Amino acid sequence: MAGPVLYQDRAMKQITFAPRNHLLTNTNTWTPDSQWLVFDVRPSGASFTGETIERVNIHTGEVEVIYRASQGAHVGVVTVHPKSEKYVFIHGPENPDETWHYDFHHRRGVIVEGGKMSNLDAMDITAPYTPGVLRGGSHVHVFSPNGERVSFTYNDHVMHELDPALDLRNVGVAAPFGPVNVQKQHPREYSGSHWCVLVSKTTPTPQPGSDEINRAYEEGWVGNHALAFIGDTLSPKGEKVPELFIVELPQDEAGWKAAGDAPLSGTETTLPAPPRGVVQRRLTFTHHRAYPGLVNVPRHWVRCNPQGTQIAFLMRDDNGIVQLWLISPQGGEPRQLTHNKTDIQSAFNWHPSGEWLGFVLDNRIACAHAQSGEVEYLTEHHANSPSADAVVFSPDGQWLAWMEGGQLWITETDR
């Protein structure tokens, strides 16, 4: 069993220095040329008060403002298109007031390209609702590997108004079959550039021991036509157990626009429903384990390798240690990849070769080999503990970025 035994001395390089916070999203934080890191300036991940989306050149330290919010709105959680300098991020409401301000169900995705901003997802909260349009808040927007679609997590204004307990988190996708135009019968409604639907299905009261879930979250692309995500099941005893699910997506525009048994845009008493034939499938069955379920701490997003053959996630081993595990998108038994003596402390990402995964271990930046599980430390002697939120490889694989003490840092990977 491989343990972390290797260490090669590499220089850690601090990239930002301004006396403010710099926040990386958990993936896709580099421009396609591997020259710039994109970030937001929220004081912490728990507050949504940043006014700018910015980028820093890793070689020169030059900082550029990509977008500045106005009218009292705030922005954050930016990711980058894999092939062009196109940025997608969360935008809070303009002119917020007591009745309508930033919340899980009051936020949208926007895309900035060439300095121009456009709404990704439209919103229509006046019945009858509009197909291709959602009713609330989208969050953590990530382009598919080919850049054609955007995944996100979602909360619903209509259900929140009915009963907050019915506003269950779900996973959605923005597909390039817009624009979608809203008649704007409410001052807070807006149109969007993409056709948006939910692709997960939740219920407020899952049957204990079943595959039903009351929350779908922390999704990751599996190739360009499937998404894996964490779904909260109930054990036979009624305890929450987060399990891994996968959903295959429609292949063409007609598939994205075809409703199933329930309306794509929902009703006054039900959430929006997935397109016809889009049905989530459970991949892990961990109720019997000593430490059931994927872990929620550290918060992590499930991530598939670039080849589309292995989905990685974090789960405790039989000793209670948080380790990396791999499973095929087709299912089967998960394979424990790492055998560390201490918990993996952060979200993780794949090296673009698919041969390594990067994360925080023992308050250092580390890589695990995707076949052997052997762990190599890339850094040591951190003045502050690296943040658990993001460890992200550059597209060329040469750099690994993280946050530490409110600043952005990189190190060479030699990979």
From Swiss-Prot:
Q: Which InterPro entries match?
A: 6-blade_b-propeller_TolB-like, DUF3748, PD40
From which residue to which does the signal peptide run?
none
Q: Which residues cross the membrane?
A: none
The protein's superkingdom reads: Bacteria
One GO biological process term: galacturonate catabolic process
SUPFAM superfamilies membership: DPP6 N-terminal domain-like
> Sorted alphabetically, which Gene3D superfamilies does this protein's record hold?
TolB, C-terminal domain
* One Pfam entry name: PD40
What is the official name of this protein in its record?
Answer: Uncharacterized protein YidR
Q: What is the originating organism of this protein?
A: Escherichia coli (strain K12)
The gene that this protein is the product of is yidR
